[in-house]
Amino acid sequence: MMCKALLLLLAATLCGSLPAQDTEETARLLALFNSHPKADIAVELVKKYEGLHDRSDYPYYGYGHRRLPNEKLSYGMTEAEAEALLRKDLAVRYRLFRKYGKDALLLTVLSYNVGQGVLLGHGGHPKSGLVRKLEARNRDIYREYTAYCRYKGKTVRSIERRRKMEFLLLYEP
Protein backbone atom coordinates (compact mmCIF):
# COMPACT_ATOMS: atom_id res chain seq x y z
CA MET A 1 0.00 0.00 0.00
CA MET A 2 2.85 2.34 0.85
CA CYS A 3 4.45 1.61 -2.53
CA LYS A 4 1.23 2.55 -4.36
CA ALA A 5 1.00 5.79 -2.39
CA LEU A 6 4.59 6.68 -3.28
CA LEU A 7 3.98 5.89 -6.96
CA LEU A 8 0.84 8.02 -6.92
CA LEU A 9 2.72 10.89 -5.29
CA LEU A 10 5.53 10.57 -7.84
CA ALA A 11 3.06 10.52 -10.74
CA ALA A 12 1.26 13.59 -9.39
CA THR A 13 4.56 15.41 -9.00
CA LEU A 14 5.62 14.56 -12.54
CA CYS A 15 2.25 15.48 -14.02
CA GLY A 16 2.26 18.73 -12.11
CA SER A 17 5.59 19.70 -13.65
CA LEU A 18 4.54 18.95 -17.23
CA PRO A 19 2.63 22.17 -17.92
CA ALA A 20 5.58 24.25 -16.73
CA GLN A 21 7.90 22.35 -19.06
CA ASP A 22 5.39 22.70 -21.87
CA THR A 23 5.11 26.46 -21.43
CA GLU A 24 8.89 26.72 -21.17
CA GLU A 25 9.29 24.79 -24.43
CA THR A 26 6.59 26.89 -26.10
CA ALA A 27 8.28 30.09 -24.97
CA ARG A 28 11.61 28.84 -26.33
CA LEU A 29 10.02 27.92 -29.67
CA LEU A 30 8.27 31.28 -29.91
CA ALA A 31 11.52 33.12 -29.17
CA LEU A 32 13.30 31.09 -31.85
CA PHE A 33 10.57 31.74 -34.42
CA ASN A 34 10.18 35.44 -33.56
CA SER A 35 13.95 35.97 -33.82
CA HIS A 36 13.74 35.27 -37.56
CA PRO A 37 13.92 38.63 -39.37
CA LYS A 38 10.92 37.80 -41.59
CA ALA A 39 8.70 36.16 -38.95
CA ASP A 40 6.35 39.15 -38.80
CA ILE A 41 5.98 39.12 -42.59
CA ALA A 42 5.11 35.41 -42.47
CA VAL A 43 2.47 36.02 -39.80
CA GLU A 44 0.94 38.91 -41.76
CA LEU A 45 0.84 36.82 -44.94
CA VAL A 46 -1.02 33.99 -43.22
CA LYS A 47 -3.42 36.47 -41.58
CA LYS A 48 -4.13 38.14 -44.93
CA TYR A 49 -4.82 34.95 -46.87
CA GLU A 50 -6.47 32.87 -44.13
CA GLY A 51 -8.64 35.52 -42.56
CA LEU A 52 -10.25 35.18 -39.15
CA HIS A 53 -12.35 32.01 -39.06
CA ASP A 54 -15.86 31.74 -37.63
CA ARG A 55 -18.27 28.92 -36.76
CA SER A 56 -18.85 28.02 -40.41
CA ASP A 57 -15.15 27.08 -40.67
CA TYR A 58 -15.25 24.38 -37.96
CA PRO A 59 -12.82 22.75 -36.94
CA TYR A 60 -10.63 25.76 -37.81
CA TYR A 61 -10.23 28.61 -35.33
CA GLY A 62 -8.41 31.94 -35.39
CA TYR A 63 -6.29 32.25 -38.51
CA GLY A 64 -6.54 28.62 -39.61
CA HIS A 65 -5.61 26.70 -36.45
CA ARG A 66 -7.12 23.23 -36.57
CA ARG A 67 -8.59 22.31 -33.19
CA LEU A 68 -6.80 19.44 -31.48
CA PRO A 69 -8.75 16.80 -29.50
CA ASN A 70 -8.10 18.19 -26.00
CA GLU A 71 -8.21 21.89 -26.84
CA LYS A 72 -10.89 24.23 -25.58
CA LEU A 73 -11.17 27.07 -28.09
CA SER A 74 -13.82 29.69 -28.74
CA TYR A 75 -14.78 31.55 -31.88
CA GLY A 76 -15.09 34.60 -29.67
CA MET A 77 -11.30 34.96 -29.38
CA THR A 78 -9.83 38.38 -30.03
CA GLU A 79 -7.55 39.10 -32.98
CA ALA A 80 -4.60 39.28 -30.57
CA GLU A 81 -5.43 35.83 -29.17
CA ALA A 82 -5.82 34.46 -32.70
CA GLU A 83 -2.46 35.92 -33.69
CA ALA A 84 -0.80 34.42 -30.60
CA LEU A 85 -2.25 31.02 -31.55
CA LEU A 86 -0.98 31.48 -35.12
CA ARG A 87 2.51 32.39 -33.91
CA LYS A 88 2.55 29.31 -31.65
CA ASP A 89 1.51 27.06 -34.56
CA LEU A 90 4.11 28.57 -36.86
CA ALA A 91 6.80 28.25 -34.18
CA VAL A 92 6.08 24.52 -33.77
CA ARG A 93 6.27 24.02 -37.53
CA TYR A 94 9.39 26.18 -37.79
CA ARG A 95 11.15 23.76 -35.44
CA LEU A 96 10.45 20.93 -37.92
CA PHE A 97 11.93 22.83 -40.85
CA ARG A 98 14.86 24.55 -39.10
CA LYS A 99 17.35 22.18 -40.71
CA TYR A 100 16.51 23.66 -44.14
CA GLY A 101 18.27 26.90 -43.19
CA LYS A 102 17.22 29.88 -45.31
CA ASP A 103 14.17 28.01 -46.60
CA ALA A 104 12.81 27.06 -43.16
CA LEU A 105 10.37 29.96 -42.93
CA LEU A 106 9.11 29.42 -46.47
CA LEU A 107 8.45 25.73 -45.74
CA THR A 108 6.83 26.66 -42.42
CA VAL A 109 4.28 28.93 -44.08
CA LEU A 110 3.59 26.41 -46.85
CA SER A 111 3.10 23.59 -44.34
CA TYR A 112 0.60 25.70 -42.40
CA ASN A 113 -1.64 25.55 -45.45
CA VAL A 114 -0.89 22.16 -47.04
CA GLY A 115 0.24 20.19 -43.97
CA GLN A 116 3.66 19.05 -42.89
CA GLY A 117 2.92 15.43 -43.78
CA VAL A 118 2.49 16.38 -47.44
CA LEU A 119 5.93 18.03 -47.45
CA LEU A 120 7.91 15.69 -45.21
CA GLY A 121 6.14 12.49 -46.19
CA HIS A 122 3.75 10.91 -43.71
CA GLY A 123 0.53 8.92 -43.76
CA GLY A 124 0.93 7.50 -47.24
CA HIS A 125 2.44 10.65 -48.72
CA PRO A 126 5.97 10.37 -50.12
CA LYS A 127 8.41 13.16 -49.34
CA SER A 128 7.64 16.10 -51.62
CA GLY A 129 9.79 16.98 -54.62
CA LEU A 130 10.30 20.41 -53.06
CA VAL A 131 11.86 18.94 -49.91
CA ARG A 132 13.88 16.37 -51.88
CA LYS A 133 15.28 19.17 -54.03
CA LEU A 134 16.27 21.19 -50.95
CA GLU A 135 17.89 18.12 -49.39
CA ALA A 136 19.94 17.75 -52.58
CA ARG A 137 21.09 21.34 -51.92
CA ASN A 138 19.29 22.67 -55.00
CA ARG A 139 17.57 25.92 -54.03
CA ASP A 140 15.98 26.56 -57.43
CA ILE A 141 12.52 25.81 -56.02
CA TYR A 142 10.19 28.45 -57.48
CA ARG A 143 8.29 26.03 -59.73
CA GLU A 144 7.98 23.38 -57.02
CA TYR A 145 6.84 25.92 -54.43
CA THR A 146 4.24 27.61 -56.61
CA ALA A 147 2.93 24.21 -57.75
CA TYR A 148 1.08 23.95 -54.40
CA CYS A 149 -1.87 25.89 -55.78
CA ARG A 150 -4.17 23.13 -56.98
CA TYR A 151 -7.50 21.84 -55.75
CA LYS A 152 -8.89 18.64 -57.25
CA GLY A 153 -6.21 18.82 -59.94
CA LYS A 154 -7.06 22.32 -61.11
CA THR A 155 -5.05 25.48 -60.52
CA VAL A 156 -6.77 27.93 -58.19
CA ARG A 157 -5.68 31.46 -59.13
CA SER A 158 -6.11 32.90 -55.63
CA ILE A 159 -3.86 30.19 -54.15
CA GLU A 160 -1.38 30.69 -56.98
CA ARG A 161 -1.21 34.43 -56.14
CA ARG A 162 -0.72 33.51 -52.48
CA ARG A 163 2.19 31.17 -53.25
CA LYS A 164 3.86 33.76 -55.48
CA MET A 165 3.50 36.44 -52.80
CA GLU A 166 4.88 34.10 -50.10
CA PHE A 167 7.84 33.22 -52.31
CA LEU A 168 8.49 36.85 -53.23
CA LEU A 169 8.48 38.04 -49.62
CA LEU A 170 10.00 35.07 -47.77
CA TYR A 171 12.56 33.52 -50.14
CA GLU A 172 16.13 34.43 -49.24
CA PRO A 173 18.59 34.06 -52.17
Regions found by a protein language model. Name each.
Residues 12, 22-25, 107:
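Intrinsically disordered/low-complexity terminal segments and short unstructured peptides
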Residues 1-3, 17:
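Universal eukaryotic N-terminal targeting presequences
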Residues 91-94, 98, 112:
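Generic short alpha-helical segment signal, independent of protein family or function
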Residues 58-61, 65:
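Early exported N-terminus immediately downstream of N-terminal targeting peptides
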Residues 54-58, 96-106, 144:
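Surface-exposed patches in mature extracellular/periplasmic domains of secreted proteins
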Residues 5-14:
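Sec-dependent N-terminal signal peptides
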Residues 104-118:
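Short N-proximal segments of mature Sec-exported proteins
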Residues 18-53, 65-72, 76-94, 118-173:
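Long, amphipathic alpha-helical surface segments
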